[in-house]
Amino acid sequence: MKSWCKNLLAVGLSVAFLSACSSSDVEEEPVSELVEIQATVFPEISWDTNVGEGVGDYYSQLRPTVRYGKLFVADRSGVVVAFDEVTGEELWSQNFNEEFEQKLRTKTKGLRLAAGVTAARKKVFVGGETGLLVALDEATGEVLWSAQANGELLSAPTVAEDVVAVNTAKGAFEGFNVDSGEKLWTYESQLPNLTLRGTSSAAYEAGGFFVGTADGKVAVVVKNNGQAAWEQPVFSPSGGNEFTRMADVDMTPLILGENLYVASYNGNLVSMELRSGRIIWSRKYSSFNELAEAGLSLYLVDDHSRIYSVDRRNGLELWSNSTLKNRELTAAAVVEGYLVVGDLEGYLHFIDRSNGDVVGRIQVDSEGLYAQPLVVDDKIYVQSRSGKIAIVTLSKQETKVEEDTNASAE
């Protein structure tokens, strides 16, 4: 089945219109088989454990975060766990379904966490498909406050000084007081008839939240009052049906210096002036994955799992890799001289940033990886669909050869 069918969210459309996504008439696109590679880097799992039951086959952007000397992890069912960053020892665990039993009594499917984990201001923030936003004490896991957002929370909250902001699936971008959970303001964007299932997390800079919208724009929302400073279309759709007019901006805008970079589904990768939103350059790429960057290069995984390196000064393509096409790749992360992406079969692939060649891989969990790997120093943190949490580290060819030689001598 085409990947976009699995991620659609209908708003006011008939079931008959969407039935094409499960129809045998929809041509399946082949998943690229893994081919033999010339490995020059050798990833190893240095630590792993399980948290809850994972996210299963559901859409989710839950991913671990590291701060305050701790690794924070959540699962879909409402379990949040803190581990010591160095030793891996479990420090505390919180089960929201027990904590919010009364509030969730009428919600037969539970909390369904899908947004987070964000750690800031000595707190840990997570959100769910019920619209519940929760703040925990980072040291103890105690629930400090909870608040109800106007719609599903499908992307990580953004904390800026005294405000925590969330982007809902109903097109409402809302700000809450970081210490009390009081709702401060709401910015409404237009929600098209058909969108991808997902929302953009916001970036924050100089008093403004920069957030992508479902109608293909980037908006700057002033932290102090929730008003829009400017809006700029990334892509203006003109297709003849709802599918071709989809233009969601579901990634976090990437801010580098005085410029902002972002891509839309069905649309463009653009560079904008941060202050005005003026488009500096625009190139045709379709993506809903987070951008990665290093030096003067942007790295993009498109909607068919093709990987690109683009010069951020002018948008010129430096290289592309389609050997992992349709493997439902995660967004890329940068680790040393490589990109790392996960796939539907639970492999992490390591790609040489200079030329796009795949130079290493390791299978973490056959149930699959779904969210962008988190890189902290020399450690790569990943979360699988089954709930496995793993730390992956790299060994270079020279080290590997030396180890093999020593083993042979023994």
Language model segments and positions:
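C-terminal motif of bacterial Sec signal peptides marking the signal peptidase cleavage site
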Residues: 18-20
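Loop/turn-rich, solvent-exposed surfaces of beta-rich toroidal or solenoidal domains
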Residues: 300-309, 316-350
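Short coil/turn segments within WD40 beta-propeller repeats
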Residues: 78, 131, 171, 216, ...
